[in-house]
């Protein structure tokens, strides 16, 4: 079992990163928020979960153990696979997701692409007592100029399956709610807000 990968970032795609460690390139699937913090040529360490199936072995990477543990916990729920688990962590960071589950916030959970009302109710039913609300701080993610943030968020949304026009409109709506001159725009925050907005308008 591969619990973490520490090495040089050699490629970044919309849904994964390739990290070279000890001469081996590892493809690690990750959320858009995590990917937005990475840069080619830099050293990075990701906490990982490995999903082994008959025809594949897939790595999923996270910035901390809390997110990784929530990912594996989500996989224990009937009907939840890696794709939905990753989409959930793309919309909500670990503390926020824990809080939503602890509060039984079905409406918040249905904002995740792929989770309907019944699926959200199942998540609450099976995880409410298992997941404690917001145990600690969150990992600080990348920040940048508004134009850079916009392009990264739009690309991430398209990678999650949304149409380009939808992605652009949602991103612009979220950015318009903030100070347009803010050079400390949070990629992670804008992405989550855009996903929540798209979830409301599905």
UniProtKB/Swiss-Prot annotation:
Region (Domain I): 1-63
One GO BP: DNA recombination
One Pfam family linked to the record: HHH_5
Superkingdom as given in the UniProt entry: Bacteria
GO molecular function: ATP binding; four-way junction DNA binding; four-way junction helicase activity
Region of interest (Flexible linker), ranges: 140-144
Entry keyword annotation includes Calcium: no
Subcellular location: Cytoplasm
Region (Domain II): 64-140
Assigned GO CC terms: cytoplasm; Holliday junction helicase complex; Holliday junction resolvase complex
Renumbered residue ranges of the record's region Domain III: 145-202
Keywords from the named record: Cytoplasm, DNA damage, DNA recombination, DNA repair, DNA-binding
Keyword DNA repair annotated: yes
NCBIfam families for this protein: ruvA (TIGR00084)
Assembly mode: Homotetramer. Forms an RuvA(8)-RuvB(12)-Holliday junction (HJ) complex. HJ DNA is sandwiched between 2 RuvA tetramers; dsDNA enters through RuvA and exits via RuvB. An RuvB hexamer assembles on each DNA strand where it exits the tetramer. Each RuvB hexamer is contacted by two RuvA subunits (via domain III) on 2 adjacent RuvB subunits; this complex drives branch migration. In the full resolvosome a probable DNA-RuvA(4)-RuvB(12)-RuvC(2) complex forms which resolves the HJ.
Domain notes: Has three domains with a flexible linker between the domains II and III and assumes an 'L' shape. Domain III is highly mobile and contacts RuvB.
The protein's role, per its UniProt record: The RuvA-RuvB-RuvC complex processes Holliday junction (HJ) DNA during genetic recombination and DNA repair, while the RuvA-RuvB complex plays an important role in the rescue of blocked DNA replication forks via replication fork reversal (RFR). RuvA specifically binds to HJ cruciform DNA, conferring on it an open structure. The RuvB hexamer acts as an ATP-dependent pump, pulling dsDNA into and through the RuvAB complex. HJ branch migration allows RuvC to scan DNA until it finds its consensus sequence, where it cleaves and resolves the cruciform DNA.
Family as reported in the entry's similarity comment: Belongs to the RuvA family.
Protein's recorded name: Holliday junction branch migration complex subunit RuvA
